[in-house]
Amino acid sequence: MATGQLFSRTTQALFYNYKQLPVQRMLDFDFLCGRETPSVAGIINPGSEGFQKLFFGQEEIAIPVHAAIEAACAAHPTADVFINFASFRSAAASSMAALKQPTIKVVAIIAEGVPESDTKQLIAYARANNKVVIGPATVGGIQAGAFKIGDTAGTIDNIIQCKLYRPGSVGFVSKSGGMSNEMYNTVARVTDGIYEGIAIGGDVFPGSTLSDHILRFNNIPQIKMMVVLGELGGRDEYSLVEALKEGKVNKPVVAWVSGTCARLFKSEVQFGHAGAKSGGEMESAQAKNQALIDAGAIVPTSFEALESAIKETFEKLVEEGKVSPIKEVIPPQIPEDLNSAIKSGKVRAPTHIISTISDDRGEEPCYAGVPMSSIIEQGYGVGDVISLLWFKRSLPRYCTKFIEICIMLCADHGPCVSGAHNTIVTARAGKDLVSSLVSGLLTIGPRFGGAIDDAARYFKDACDRNLTPYEFVEGMKKKGIRVPGIGHRIKSRDNRDKRVELLQKFARSNFPSVKYMEYAVTVETYTLSKANNLVLNVDGAIGSLFLDLLAGSGMFTKQEIDEIVQIGYLNGLFVLARSIGLIGHTFDQKRLKQPLYRHPWEDVLYTK
């Protein structure tokens, strides 16, 4: 292991199995230290995605939530620490998955009781791949003024009291997380404070040992002395003894092994941790303390004397000029949360909406980060605005031109279709523009204009699975599903839909690939062998060509394409386009002052 620092002021982590308080404490520590970016880059919650709202100082931020470790690592390649709050049942599997990600360098396992066989596998893999495991059964670690893991060092008040908001000169490592909090306070009282502190965890087989971190501290110039707090049970301390004897550590080490009282008991005693139990003589606290003394460590006569030993060692370093004075800073005040601040009037209230597509807080609105003035000055069109507000990126001009063509071709299709009919009837009833528009829009669905998304889904699935038109169509037939995007009440083989022809012509001339459109055409060829009106309609044309636009632009991942189709972007295109015509029909009826519409009796079949 060895090498040097694990963390810095720019270190970011992925947090597995979301727990609100530890994450918020990390972010509060970040703010206290004056970090510019939050230390939590993303949260992994198996089975859920989205954003989690948390506070970074006075501002509320949205931290991405990912369903899988692989997706989180891909989305946040600079995050190299994995903080695992999974239960002992799943901690090993998720930790191994994290270790196998090339971007992850450090894994902290909080859970206690991870099977020892699983822990051994994690240790072996980490060592073979030059990675670091902290834990299991750990509270984590901290680099003062830079980064902390989860609940390390406790509350903000304790962190301030221990001066952990700025770096000191002492490297500290212990097995116990609870005792590490006590020792941070002790070190702060008699020295200039902690530089880095690690709790390796109390299980029998820790992922990294006391000596691993002492050797690492020895390579960090800012650390001038080390403090070690071991405990009875196991032989971890002896690896530190060997390192001291071999001269691998050239900085003062103050050490104490807790558990000297175990000899007062007649039988074996199990203390708090799995690894803290009295066993053979070599595992006793007395034997370990003596071995550390013999190796050159500074070991007091009791735990009560540990503070004095640390103080004397530090003062000696100061006298020798090996420690430079630390510049004290005043940490910022962390805002209180709402419930605790109501009485005092110090409040920060959570937001209720997350928006990622536009921002109107500056001097001018921005669409996906592009200022309104730039949109006008650079000659953006409606298609460009849609690409920013719908897809959150600037698409190539041929893509935005295609969007504009779709809008123009789908703006209206006469007064006889269901949407226009409803709008006309509503307008003639004296209703307002919005009511008339909505009346028409509500007819859009699987039978009228709303088949674009379904057409895209089915064509994509069939094409991606290399189904022949026969397999695709007959498979749909067996399921009792009509093929979306195929069939028209008016158009036929001999009377093609001009809109479809125009879209296909544009795509063949401008798209880098029309794979999905060509597949839709082969499906049309097959369906026309069954009936003359089973032509590719405008829904099918837009659906298949939009797949080609998304895939051919090179600006979308497969997952993003699937999400776009699933959410209903393509039907949104028809809704937007047809709104133009429906508004036109509303104005037309009102301008013509048409009376209330009543359907004629002769057009109704009255039957029992």
UniProtKB/Swiss-Prot annotation:
Cysteines joined through disulfide linkages: none
CDD domains per the UniProt record, alphabetical: CCL_ACL-C
Q: Which of this chain's residues are annotated to bind ATP?
A: 214-234, 265-291
GO terms for biological process?
A: acetyl-CoA biosynthetic process; lipid metabolic process
Name the UniProt key words of this record, in alphabetical order. Answer: Acyltransferase, ATP-binding, Cytoplasm, Lipid biosynthesis, Lipid metabolism, Magnesium, Metal-binding, Nucleotide-binding, Transferase
Query: What GO MF annotations does this protein's record show?
Result: ATP binding; ATP citrate synthase activity; metal ion binding
**UniProt-listed InterPro entries:** Cit_synth/succinyl-CoA_lig_AS, Citrate_synth-like_lrg_a-sub, Citrate_synth-like_sm_a-sub, Citrate_synthase, Citrate_synthase_sf, Citrt_syn/SCS-alpha_CS, NAD(P)-bd_dom_sf, Succ-CoA_synthase_bsu_CS
Q: How does it assemble?
A: Heterooctamer of 4 alpha and 4 beta chains.
Tell me, in a sentence or two, what this protein's role is: ATP citrate-lyase is the primary enzyme responsible for the synthesis of cytosolic acetyl-CoA, used for the elongation of fatty acids and biosynthesis of isoprenoids, flavonoids and malonated derivatives. May supply substrate to the cytosolic acetyl-CoA carboxylase, which generates the malonyl-CoA used for the synthesis of a multitude of compounds, including very long chain fatty acids and flavonoids. Required for normal growth and development and elongation of C18 fatty acids to C20 to C24 fatty acids in seeds.
What is this protein's record name?
ATP-citrate synthase beta chain protein 2
UniProt source species: Arabidopsis thaliana (Mouse-ear cress)
